[in-house]
């Protein structure tokens, strides 16, 4: 299983939100590139990034930071947050990003998702943000009509390879991850699933590893010191 340490970007800084709430933001670093280099020094091969400003308004104000990390480290960079047009996908991928995550747009704009997969294949991933059993959109502010299963079924049929699945109720709360949900999903679908939200102790990593998931994202637990990144990477192997 691959470990994806995470950087959320806002105003060119590395920040974290509590349960997706923009009013509960903690700034962890003024220099995200330093954080990424630190991940790399600790043995990380992947990095998960979200542009929180982009998630709100569909722009790319942190593109230069993302490009820097893609080009000045050897990390596999995946980025999400407000990617709603082919122009934005092109921008990120030509800046050196390895994989782009479509969130709201994958739920609301089937044609866009289809053409993105046709053009870029495995470089396109989908973010499934789960709230009360349904897929949430628009920076977690709205609930869509899709249940989790209906959405996974559809994505698999459309040729999506990787889904980053977040239980919003667990995100940033440091109360553990939704093991039952990931266990059920990994048994039902042949997608590469990345667990996100609430991975807050090394035991969470061990439990997810047993399910043979493709990946797990570690965010707040890294910044607060609750998880040692090097140990998590070892345990996940």
Label each PLM-derived region with a short phrase.
Residues 8, 39, 47, 92, ...:
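Conserved, mostly hydrophobic/aromatic
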Residues 12-15, 19-23, 98-171:
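Conserved anion-binding
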Residues 77-96, 180-215:
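Catalytic cores of alpha/beta
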Residues 46-62, 104, 165-175:
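Glycine-rich, proline-tolerant flexible connector loops at the mouths of alpha/beta enzymes
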Residues 60-67, 110, 141-150, 175-183:
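Charged helix-capping and loop-helix junction motifs
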């Amino acid at each position: 299983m691959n470990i994806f340490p995470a950087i959320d970007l806002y105003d060119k800084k590395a920040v974290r939100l509590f349960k997706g709430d923009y009013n509960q933001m903690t700034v962890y670093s003024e220099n995200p590139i330093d954080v990424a280099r630190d991940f790399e020094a600790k043995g990380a091969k992947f990095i998960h990034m979200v542009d929180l400003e982009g998630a709100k308004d569909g722009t790319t104000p942190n593109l230069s930071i993302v490009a820097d990390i893609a080009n000045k480290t050897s990390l596999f960079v995946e980025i999400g947050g407000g990617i709603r047009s082919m122009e934005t996908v092109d921008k990120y991928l030509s800046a050196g990003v390895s994989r782009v995550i479509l969130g709201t747009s994958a739920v609301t704009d089937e044609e866009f998702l289809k053409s993105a997969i046709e053009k870029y294949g495995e470089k396109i991933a989908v973010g499934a943000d789960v709230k009360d059993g349904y897929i949430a959109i628009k920076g977690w502010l709205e609930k869509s009509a899709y249940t989790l299963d209906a959405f996974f079924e559809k994505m698999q049929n459309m040729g999506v390879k990787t889904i980053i699945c977040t239980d919003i109720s667990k995100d940033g709360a440091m109360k553990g991850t939704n093991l039952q949900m990931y266990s059920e999903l990994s048994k039902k679908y042949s997608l590469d699933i990345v667990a996100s939200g609430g991975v807050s102790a090394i035991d969470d990593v061990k439990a997810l590893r047993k399910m043979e998931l493709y990946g797990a994202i570690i965010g707040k637990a890294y910044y607060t010191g609750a998880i040692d990144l090097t140990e998590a990477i070892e345990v996940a192997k």
